[in-house]
Amino acid sequence: MTERQLRSPYLHIETRGLRSLDEPASVADLARAFAHVLPDDVAFSHLTACALWNLPMPVHGAEPLLHVMRDSDRARIRRAQCQGHRGLELRTVAELESLRVVGHLDTWCDLGELFPAHVSFEDLVSVGDCIVNRWGDDGPEHPELAAVLGRRVRPRGGQTLGRALRAIRYGSRSPMETRTRLMFAKAGFPEPRLNAWVSDSDGGWLLTGDLVWDEKRVVAEYQGSTHFPLAARSQDADRAAVALDHGARLFEVFSEDVFSRGRRRRLLVRVARALDLDLARLTID
């Protein structure tokens, strides 16, 4: 291209030496574009790796940077829209759609470095839940994640990662299910079974609930966007009525019940009463 063509207002200038006709529509598109101007020895890491592995991203939005990492004996990447890191020799690297990406287990540990500025405790548990459910690290202490964390020497965010590791559970099917579970745990509720069967009056299958407290036959169900169409709402209402017919109580949980303090308090009180819990012993906030 000529110098004049390179200065065309129709070209997107992503970074030094990189122009494109179309603005990248995703983190993966941006990473693929940057791969043309980055050294061959780098790998995408931290929140960028999280997005490339299709792991849950921070609920309040990630910083608009590409995280890139290389070995400790190489200069840190310094480039517009990039956050450079070192230490790649201590991590596993995978290839995803021709991109070098830090492994998913190491990525979870690396996210601890971004706590609390860009990643919350709930974010760390959500990513951990996704990893153990997708890759089958279902031991009670999640040995693969624990092993990767154990190999780190005084990692930034290490205490928070250790606490998050103890809160990770096999069986959660979505980030918002994880956040709903953590909401009840923080309030002091007994731990429910995850995505568990609830039986009908004859002992047969009645429904599978997101969070199930067996003793009192109480179920909490997170209702995401797939439950918004009228047909889905009709099905959910019938499901709750059938559950009640068989002596089970089903509580619907929406995002506002998790993130809005007033809605959260009211939901926690309702479920606590259904479980015959002493409100004075709970942290309803």
Predicted regions and their residues:
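Surface segments flanking catalytic/ligand-binding clefts of nucleic-acid enzymes
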Residues: V132-D285
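Short gly/ser-rich loop at a beta-strand->alpha-helix junction or flexible surface loop bordering the NTP-binding
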Residues: M1-R156, L277-D285
